[in-house]
From Swiss-Prot:
It is found in: Secreted. Coiled coil: none annotated. This is Extended FMRFamide-9. Its main location: secreted. FMRFamides and FMRFamide-like peptides are neuropeptides. The modification Leucine amide is found at L11. GO terms for cellular component: extracellular region. Keywords: Amidation, Neuropeptide, Secreted. Disulfide bonds: none annotated. It comes from the Eukaryota. It comes from Mantophasma kudubergense. Belongs to the FARP (FMRF amide related peptide) family. One of its GO terms (biological process) is neuropeptide signaling pathway.
Amino acid sequence: GRGGSSNYVRL
């Protein structure tokens, strides 16, 4: 996803 903690890696 977008901006998070673990979500940040899969922009």
